[in-house]
Amino acid sequence: MELQHHIKCKPGDLGRSVLLPGDLERAKLISTFMDRPRHVASSREFNTYTGEFQDVPVSVISTGVGAPSASIVVEEAIKVGARNMIRVGTCGALQPNVHPGDLIIATAAVRGDGTTPEYIDMSYPAVADFHLVRALVDAADELGASYHLGVIRTHDAFYME
């Protein structure tokens, strides 16, 4: 497998688990929580770090804003060995009980974006992996973090409801 065109990674550069923030600086910040972090690559909005967390190889790659650039990262990361990916970063909420800093753990998504229909028909439900959701809930409980579980909505217009 060759070097990936956009993320500039090759097999062995990434852990099986990858965090996907939109912002390059957030990727750098996340890497500071890793043991032995190393900067793997930078290309356009894609900034990649790999290290270890609790002796497990993990990576973080910034995706830029939106589903189209995130899909580039996901496709190329899979080609070089990533298997578990979690999008982290900005979201909004309409419920008054959701506060800044609360975690949102998506159990499913209403797809209102233009990218996901390129992968699968809109009639197919976008439901999160149960085991991954359970692991996120367990971790949030262990940390004492405030979190909310539920169905999210994704779409292309950042400031539109």
Describe these PLM feature segments:
Residues 1-134:
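Metabolite-binding pocket within alpha/beta catalytic cores that recognizes anionic/polar moieties
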Residues 126-161:
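Active-site rim beta-loop-alpha module in soluble metabolic enzymes
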